[in-house]
Amino acid sequence: MQGNALTVLLSGKKYLLLQGPMGPFFSDVAEWLESLGRNAVNVVFNGGDRFYCRHRQYLAYYQTPKEFPGWLRDLHRQYDFDTILCFGDCRPLHKEAKRWAKAKGIRFLAFEEGYLRPQFITVEEGGVNAYSSLPRDPDFYRKLPDMPTPHVENLKPSTMKRIGHAMWYYLMGWHYRHEFPRYRHHKSFSPWYEARCWVRAYWRKQLYKVTQRKVLPRLMNELDQRYYLAVLQVYNDSQIRNHSSYNDVRDYINEVMYSFSRKAPKESYLVIKHHPMDRGHRLYRPLIKRLSKEYGLGERILYVHDLPMPELLRHAKAVVTINSTAGISALIHNKPLKVMGNALYDIKGLTYQGHLHQFWQADFKPDMKLFKKFRGYLLVKTQVNAVYY
């Protein structure tokens, strides 16, 4: 990939935009591309997609993912697009599009949540996360010159806009479901289920403000540098399904707690951080309580919600993750890191390469000179200073 992420994004002439984030972002991107002299066509797959493309012309796809390559082939004869854009490269329709584009020599660019949040979003040619084309060889980065620090506008994504757009997306998807009978969403697509989860998430957040108000001061003082931080991801994260050996987050919790009970220093603690976007969907307290008893961990396990990640990282001794982008944040804080899945930053010298059993007492620190080179390259090649909401 040549040039920076924005240059790569703009190097096409005719664009086909598939499914984007819930909301108007991909419609806005299409209009932006057209304002720069490119051609851009949106494809809608459900009522939510169509609702957010209602102010511009679009193409509708009504078939199954298996039939998508044939549809793309026929479309390409009429509209010879040279670039496909999508959000996330693990959705069934996007997987089919990626395979077809690769065979035809057509550029496939995937958007994703920012690797370096919150001021950035990710755009990569060929794939994102563990499908990224970024080199995994540490010597590649060590030989790089220092990257100039780009100007960064201090953007902050709006949680309320995200919720509002999600609400309308799910409602329109349900309202027009009979017009897209073969569409299958990559996650739950019921507005009523999601609404219940969001209401539950709100009340749990208020509850945790009370029940966990003393936890962070304890971690910052009494347990400073005495705890390992295990980061949880959302239960239906495609990065777990596609880029790890785990079938469920619960399998990860079990493995980490078992290993910690057997090999970690007896005076250490394990802090398990729940993902804030999963607050209304899943709760692991019964599982963690049962495993704590089974593995004889007693009071050495702390299960936390909604505590600020920078503070948790700053006071942690080390960090374990499946493949969350929180792993990059751990490296920013110069913390020893063990990756249990596949991640683009799981590079020798940055992360611990041995078994989890040995990690707890390993004399390992990330090479921060290497990380500086890696982060600079990552920023220039994959990040765009923007937000989705």
Curated annotation (Swiss-Prot):
InterPro entries: Capsule_polysaccharide_synth (IPR007833)
Any single biological process term in GO: polysaccharide transport
Keyword set includes Phosphoprotein: no
Pfam families listed in its UniProt record: Capsule_synth (PF05159)
Keywords: Polysaccharide transport, Sugar transport, Transport
Superkingdom of origin organism: Bacteria
Listed name of the protein: Capsule polysaccharide export protein KpsS
Origin species: Escherichia coli
Organismal lineage: Bacteria, Pseudomonadati, Pseudomonadota, Gammaproteobacteria, Enterobacterales
